[in-house]
Swiss-Prot record:
Occurrences of domain 5'-3' exonuclease (ranges): 164-250
Protein's name according to its UniProt entry: Flap endonuclease Xni
Record Pfam families: 5_3_exonuc (PF01367), 5_3_exonuc_N (PF02739)
Annotated source species: Shewanella loihica (strain ATCC BAA-1088 / PV-4)
Keywords for the protein's UniProt record, in alphabetical order: DNA-binding, Endonuclease, Hydrolase, Magnesium, Metal-binding, Nuclease, Potassium
CDD domains (UniProt xref): H3TH_53EXO (cd09898), PIN_53EXO (cd09859)
Cofactor(s) required for function per UniProt: Mg(2+); K(+)
Lineage: Bacteria, Pseudomonadati, Pseudomonadota, Gammaproteobacteria, Alteromonadales
Chain positions recorded as K(+) binding sites: M172, A173, P181, I183, I186
GO molecular function, one term: 5'-flap endonuclease activity
HAMAP family linked to this entry: Xni
Length: 256
């Protein structure tokens, strides 16, 4: 069975670089990143591998909601300037890349989904828990830095809801890390209780007459933000990709 190792490029590289005392010091970065990639190959033994990188264009999520991911620390300039040479270094060693137009997330989600459609498996390497909405027996999420899988069960315990409710939960409760607004006045506890009672966001809105007046008012006033938040959280799995799986087959140079 084919197994596709899909590495969230900047998620990996920025964390490796952050271990440096001086953010302007990129000496040895290509070797450290290559070493990490080879360890991932050894751990997961994939048939295919790629790194997916964020692009420079404004993402559709940012266009939809200007506060999306607002306030995040920008990439150090030295690291930004080092990326082209880093990608070339990796390619020469068998680790080829896909450059997203904007965010890498939807490209990663599309690659993983297409691999499953082709009766294969996908392992996403990232610490971004947004990918947990994709998890299934065929799609895994691996945290390289803690050397452990991020499982559906972990996320269920963290949020207090079932796997099928992850997106609905965040649409109501929001996600401060990504500046997803959610519904004002409906925090994680309320979102969890509502989903335990009504199962889905759609059912919540179909049952406002069964909810206390104060909370129902918050839900009604926040309906548009809930719809917006749902769109922001949900990963797209059908991004057009002008590439072939064969381009990412693991090469002997990557295993060396």
């Amino acid at each position: 069975m084919n197994r596709f190792l899909i590495i969230d490029g900047l998620n990996l590289v920025r964390r490796i670089h952050a271990a440096q005392p001086n953010e302007n010091d990129v000496n040895g970065l290509p070797e450290r990143v290559t070493s990490a990639c080879r360890k991932l190959l050894s751990k997961h033994n994939p048939s295919h591998v790629t790194l997916v990188w964020d692009g420079d264009a404004i993402s559709w999520r940012k266009k939809l909601y200007d506060d999306y991911k607002k306030g995040r620390k920008p990439m150090p300039e030295a690291l930004s300037q080092a990326l082209p040479a880093l990608k070339q270094h990796l390619a020469e060693r068998g680790f080829h890349s896909i450059d997203a137009i904007a965010e890498a997330d939807d490209v990663i989600a599309t690659l993983a989904s297409k691999m499953v459609q082709a009766k294969g498996e996908a392992i996403i390497v990232s610490t971004d828990k947004g990918f947990t909405q994709l998890l299934s027996p065929q799609i895994q999420l691996w945290d390289h830095f803690n050397q452990q899988a991020i499982t559906i069960e972990d996320r269920e315990r963290q949020l207090g809801v079932d796997r099928s409710q992850f997106i609905d939960f965040l649409a109501m409760a929001g996600d401060s890390g990504n500046k997803i607004p959610g519904i004002p006045g409906i925090g994680p506890k309320s979102a969890c209780e509502l989903l335990k009672t009504f199962r889905t966001l759609a059912n919540v809105y179909a049952s406002l007459d069964k909810i206390g007046a104060k909370q129902a008012k918050k839900l009604e006033e926040g309906r548009a933000l809930a719809r917006l938040s749902y769109k922001l959280v949900q990963l797209q799995t059908d991004i057009p990709l002008n590439t072939r799986l064969a381009n990412f087959r693991v090469e002997l140079t990557a295993k060396a």
